[in-house]
Amino acid sequence: MTMRSKTFSDRILNDSEFFKWCQKEESRNADSITLYKSILEFESKFKSGSPSLSLLKLARHIHRKYVSLNTGTCNVIEDSTRTEMSKRVHEVLDGKSPYIELFDPLKQPLFQHLRSMHTEYSTTTADVSNTWEDTSSTDSSDKGATIWFNDDAIDRSSRHEISQNTVTHESEDDRFAFFNAVCTRLNSLQETKNSSETEEEKKKERSADPYGSDGFAPPPQSTQTHTLRNLPKRFESLYKKKRQQNTTTTDSSGFGSNASDFWSFERYGKSNHGTLERPNRLFPGSNNGFSTLQPKKRSGEIQKLTVELRYENDVPMVAKISANQSVTLRYFRHLFGLHYSDNCRFFFKSTCEDGSAHYQWTLLFQDDDILPVFQNRITAICRMCPPPPEDHHLI
């Protein structure tokens, strides 16, 4: 790959807007960007002298998530290339030393796909800056067109036309014709701009401004309270009684001046204006229609068993399965998608047989072996091992 192509690929991979644009449609396959980054990460780790285990994990991840015909998501690569890559990765996982050219067959088709997608993205984003933009309002009489004056777009179009129709201006007539053409173009653009400004001013004049033309807001709407309607039923009889007695408010200027509390009912009604009437909360035995229902435990709920797999120095992978079944090593491999020829050993946590420790790690390698359950869960750890001799196949 040339220096120019390398710079172009770096610009594509680091363009966050381009990545978001690819995610909008499945056909653009945004995973191709992530795959290309992962390949560069693999090569960088190889050059820096990372351990073989780290390279194997990364190669396994790239193959399973993007390249594999069964589980891969990067479908822009031809099936023949993906099959070749699967063969390469399996050879490395079976004991062959990792090498920096492992993913070279993927780089060229990925680069071509990213270049074509970025060309389409550049064209699309350039077309978004349209010179004309139609706008409409709620009222049919207020509909109009808003003109957006884009100097950059006009400048690009002018340069394009000039490059197609090159005028040498050698004679006086050619220069005069060019002068008239420029004046005609400028006058047309000026009229377009003036028309746009006129339409904008008309829209502002017709717009429904809540503050009016003089900048003052209209007075707020009156809030009329209906005290008797909003008053709870337990206060209704007491309210009517006080209204019939024509109670007058007394002087309340002093502290504890025996002021009438008749105003409190008015305030109570006003504060509850426009709110939902809630039932009496003084009686806990009443049925509240607005209360949150307490969750009821279903009697037929199926119990789950947690199955955990952890690679060395890696985060655990967890699965939930039905607890009413016996789990074999074959089902365990199928559950986590583990390849049959992987050079790894699975150790399962179980109760210590001699009682010298709280638990022990038991090695299981037969597909029909039943996995031990320790503390209501199955816990496994995977360790990478060198390939066994040809006359001993444990897995």
Swiss-Prot record:
Domain DIX: from-to ranges: 301-386
Start and end residues of each stretch annotated as Disordered: 190-230
Transmembrane segments: none
Keyword flag Cytoplasm: no
InterPro entries registered for this protein in UniProt: DIX, DIX_dom_sf, RGS, RGS_sf, Ubiquitin-like_domsf
Superkingdom to which the source organism belongs: Eukaryota
Disulfide linkage: none
Its job: Works in parallel with pry-1 in negatively regulating bar-1 signaling in vulval precursor cells and Q neuroblasts. Shown to have a role in excretory cell development.
Subunit: Interacts with bar-1, dsh-2, gsk-3, and mig-5.
Protein name (record): Axin-like protein 1
